[in-house]
């Protein structure tokens, strides 16, 4: 009877057990005595089923089957996201293994394959005469060595691309005693685990010069710096003037005095605005460059734009999503030339609430290009600003009146509002190094344009939802409880409180923070509490902006999700449904993919899904692709800025600066 109870216990079990684990399981689950558990475990092992894994015998639950697991960050994770600690002496991040589930860990049965063989590394020479290479593009340390015949002349701060030598790995390490030496002395030299045989593919750059730092950041985060020839050829063929046939069927808004307002160093102008009074409320027109007119699905330009996902901005350079012929040319709303646009024409009531809107393909001619500095100077009553705006002053003043209404509406809905102050690096163009740092103040001129863009973005999301179509929404989830607890601990040190976990609670907290002498670190702490916004076809609203629906419509020159949204809207206007293509999933990988819950090895191929599921899954994976591209771009920009700042400080060893610690990284 007891053995029948034991067999029934394991009838639905999907784990494997050692003899010791089997005894413990019987004791805990069936309340057997130690003696009975010992006898029962031995009997079960005798009758089976059992499986032998690496010279050890395991009792196999009736539902126990091998599963695919991925190794990363000293843990193994299966397709369901279950993760267990693992210490493998010989494993690269992303390696796949076949394993059985155990009661407290995965039992590795066999190695399946590496998912990544090429790495960026810095070469290091040791006094004992051997070389190692430490990775630049992994989030945990890995060590490589190269054959004697290939060892380059050691160059400190030089980054190389290397490839794991699978043949040498499979043949066994010819330097077995070398590995033993490393393992015995890992504490002395910083080694851990296996030192991989590898070959040098190419030298990337030196890390101690500005162009090298930029190149390394591009490589480390997968930025595509050179456009393929087929993309360049297609860009060359794009006409640089709007033709009569292209104007046909579009709303003609060339007489409307649109203006573009951007930063002084902006080169691509993808939005223009105009507003006028309408009864007690307002009419706002937001015109956005119609990139979809020139970037067609399944063409080289579109394939490359999707692979890039976004433009990447560095202090010294820009890696554009689209070639310059489009981004700074025919798609840029330069003044006094005709341009094709998608226009959001919105009516707002006296409190700034949208009452109606429509989207139209249009042609316009920007009447002026002005800068944030010029606009703010005029709005502040300065003569220089009045002179710079000229005859456009009246339109800008009207926009400012509307901004005040929209800003008041923002405060009423408790949208999060962080005091924005940025530090701009001024670059010595000849040397490519930082000449100085300057504070860059965000003024109402910047916020004016931002609020206009928000109106268009919300209307675009609403338009898609009302027409029951799929697109990529910009979604932002509420903060996680664990992060809230961390924030509360920080606030206690400053005698501050988050009185309630709600938009109103955060709005009140941010007002208190603004009055604190420690405004900057506290704002950073609040910001880090927030979830990161991302792109998804599943609308959950935007917590930070306090919108029930939101999407990115206003920057198709530099963001691929905006281009997808334009195509969706155009298809709706034409009474069609837009079905995008996912050209490659190679960008949905790495650290950020894992953080977003996507594990390529465990994902079902899109082509194997039903038509309905396939459409949604393509949108989902496009959202992941674009979210990851955005985060990689942020990482790359931050890397270069940090390097330039450190390089600037290294030239000033005797200078002192007042500073505040805002985060501990390690």
Protein language model annotation of sequence segments:
Residues 1-285, 292-337, 369-370, 374-377, ...:
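Charge-lined substrate channels and their catalytic hotspots, especially those that engage the 3′ end
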Residues 9, 25, 203, 217-221, ...:
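Residues that form generic nucleotide/phosphate-binding pockets
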Residues 14, 18, 49-52, 172, ...:
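Residue-level signal for secondary-structure boundary elements
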Residues 35, 459, 477, 482-487, ...:
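Structured C-terminal cores of nucleic-acid metabolism proteins
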Residues 80-81, 188-228, 398-402, 443, ...:
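Extended, compositionally biased low-complexity polar/Lys-Gly-rich tracts
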Residues 84, 168, 262-481, 489-496, ...:
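Feature marking long nucleic-acid-engaging regions of large polymerase/nuclease enzymes
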Residues 135, 349, 428, 663-665:
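Acidic/polar residues at beta-strand termini and the immediately following turn/coil
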């Amino acid at each position: 009877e007891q053995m029948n109870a034991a067999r029934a216990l394991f009838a639905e079990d999907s784990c494997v057990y050692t003899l010791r684990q089997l005894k413990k399981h019987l004791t805990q689950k069936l309340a057997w005595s130690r003696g009975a558990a010992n006898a029962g475990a031995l009997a079960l092992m005798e009758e089976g089923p059992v499986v032998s894994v690496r010279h050890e015998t395991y009792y196999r639950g009736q539902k126990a089957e091998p599963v695919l697991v991925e190794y990363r960050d000293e843990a193994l994770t299966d397709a369901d996201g279950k993760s267990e600690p693992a210490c493998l002496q010989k494993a690269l991040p992303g390696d796949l293994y076949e394993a059985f589930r155990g009661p407290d860990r995965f039992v590795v049965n066999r190695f399946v394959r590496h998912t990544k063989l090429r790495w960026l590394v810095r070469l290091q020479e040791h006094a004992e005469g051997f070389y190692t290479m430490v990775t630049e593009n992994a989030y945990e340390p890995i060590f490589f060595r190269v054959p004697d015949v290939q060892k380059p002349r050691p160059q400190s701060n030089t980054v190389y691309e290397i490839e794991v030598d699978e043949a040498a790995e499979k043949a066994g390490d010819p330097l077995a005693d070398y590995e033993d030496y490393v393992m015995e002395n890992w504490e002395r030299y910083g080694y851990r685990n296996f030192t991989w045989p590898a070959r040098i593919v190419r030298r990337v750059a030196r890390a101690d010069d500005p162009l090298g730092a930029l190149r390394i950041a591009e490589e480390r985060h997968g930025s595509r710096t050179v456009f393929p020839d087929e993309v360049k050829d297609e860009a060359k063929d794009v006409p640089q003037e709007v033709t009569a046939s292209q104007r046909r069927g579009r709303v003609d808004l060339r007489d409307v005095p649109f203006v573009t307002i951007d930063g002084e160093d902006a080169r691509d102008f993808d939005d223009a605005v105009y507003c006028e009074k309408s009864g007690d409320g307002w009419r706002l027109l937001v015109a956005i460059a119609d990139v979809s007119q020139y970037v067609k699905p399944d063409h080289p330009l579109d394939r490359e734009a999707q692979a890039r996902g976004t433009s990447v901005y560095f202090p010294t350079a820009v890696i554009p999503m689209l070639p310059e012929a489009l981004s700074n040319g025919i798609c840029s709303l330069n003044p006094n030339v005709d341009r094709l646009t998608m226009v959001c024409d919105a009516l707002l009531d006296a409190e700034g609430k949208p009452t109606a809107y429509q989207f139209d393909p249009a042609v316009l001619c920007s009447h002026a290009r002005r800068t944030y500095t010029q606009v703010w100077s005029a709005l502040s009553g300065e003569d220089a600003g009045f002179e710079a705006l000229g005859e456009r002053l009246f339109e800008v003043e009207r926009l400012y009146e509307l901004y005040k209404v929209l800003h008041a509406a923002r405060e009423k809905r408790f949208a999060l509002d962080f005091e924005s102050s940025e530090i701009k690096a001024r670059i010595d163009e000849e040397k490519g190094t930082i000449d100085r740092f300057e504070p860059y103040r965000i003024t109402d001129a910047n916020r004016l344009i931002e609020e206009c863009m928000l109106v268009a973005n919300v209307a675009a999301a609403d338009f898609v939802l009302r027409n029951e179509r799929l697109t990529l929404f910009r979604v932002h989830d509420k903060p996680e409880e664990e992060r809230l607890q961390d924030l509360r601990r920080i606030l206690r040190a400053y005698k501050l409180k988050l009185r309630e976990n709600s938009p109103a609670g955060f709005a009140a907290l941010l007002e208190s923070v603004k009055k604190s002498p420690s405004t900057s670190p506290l704002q950073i702490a609040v910001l880090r509490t927030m979830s990161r916004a991302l792109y998804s076809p599943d609308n959950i609203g935007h917590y930070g902006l306090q919108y029930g629906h939101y999407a990115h419509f206003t920057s198709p020159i530099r963001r691929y999700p905006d281009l997808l949204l334009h195509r969706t809207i155009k298809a709706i206007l034409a009474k069609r449904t837009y079905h995008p293509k996912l050209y490659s999933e190679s960008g949905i990988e790495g650290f950020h993919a894992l953080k977003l819950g996507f594990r390529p090895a465990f994902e079902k191929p899109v082509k194997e899904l039903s038509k309905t599921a396939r459409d949604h899954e393509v949108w989902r994976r496009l959202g992941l692709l674009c979210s990851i591209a955005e985060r990689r771009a942020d990482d790359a920009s931050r890397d270069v800025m940090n390097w330039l700042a450190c390089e600037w400080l290294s030239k000033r060893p005797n200078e002192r600066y007042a500073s505040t610690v805002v985060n501990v990284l390690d």
